[in-house]
Design a protein with these regions (language model features):
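Family-specific signature for flavin-dependent thymidylate synthase
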Residues: 1-238
Length: 238
């Protein structure tokens, strides 16, 4: 399971300006701040959608002109040494995913920053429930939602119950022994939230390396990343 929320993308204006520095070609730039709400079917150079019956301010974007897009594509195909502008376009997003996936994401340390919810400090903050864990592939569900206790899904439910027992014990007597029981018993399927900031270069690296990955989480994230502004156009993706 993976959930992605609160996506923000910025940096287009300065990235494009810097992209044109080597050839002093700023006068050829044809991109501009705009608004695209998805209802009007247009992008207005003035940043105001028509008609004006609805508020479009949450849909601010940066409209790429054909000149800038063509140069972006050319530099993109030239390789990482030529497409430095990608490292100046920034995306931030909140990702909730299981610990087993985060271990793989930590491969991408260069050019990324992640701030996570703290397991060390807050593991006891709320009751554990099955929805806190990624278990969509576990076997064991019987008709009408019943669970076979000897199945993988049943083992997870037993583990969740034990985690709650240790949590209750810790809340009644907050000593480190009970805390250790939760920390060391916590399965790698536990879903953890992080706020991640990275560049478009990181985005394209992930797409190249993970799009066909065996984990659903990677494939789902890749589909979301391909939906970021202008990613498909710049990279020639489908």
């Amino acid at each position: 399971m993976i959930k992605v929320e609160n996506i923000e993308v910025w940096g287009w204006e300065h990235a494009i300006r810097g992209m044109r520095n080597p050839m002093n070609s700023w006068d050829k730039s044809d991109s501009y701040p705009a608004v695209y709400c998805g209802k009007c079917g247009i992008v207005e150079r003035e940043g105001v959608c028509q008609p004006k019956e609805h508020d479009c301010t949450p849909y601010e974007c940066y409209a790429l002109g054909p000149n800038d897009l063509s140069l972006m594509q050319k530099l993109f195909n030239g390789g990482t040494e030529h497409r430095k502008y990608l490292r100046q376009i920034i995306v931030s997003l909140d990702i909730t995913a299981p610990l087993y996936w985060w271990k793989e994401f930590d491969t991408y340390k260069v050019g990324t920053v992640a701030n996570s919810c703290s397991t060390m400090h807050k593991i006891q903050a709320k009751e554990f429930v099955m929805e806190d864990f990624s278990h969509e592939h576990l076997l064991g569900e019987i008709d009408d939602g019943l669970i076979d206790q000897d199945s993988p899904l049943g083992v997870l439910r037993t583990t969740v119950a034990m985690l709650n027992n240790m949590r209750d014990a810790y809340l009644q007597n907050p000593n480190k022994l009970h805390w250790w029981q939760m920390i060391q018993l916590l399965p790698s399927s536990y879903n953890k939230r992080r706020t991640v900031t990275m560049s478009y270069e990181n985005v394209f690296t992930i797409l190249r390396q993970r799009e066909g990955h065996k984990l659903d989480e990677w494939r789902n994230l890749c589909e979301i990343l391909k939906g970021l502004p202008n990613v498909k156009e710049i990279g020639g993706l489908t």
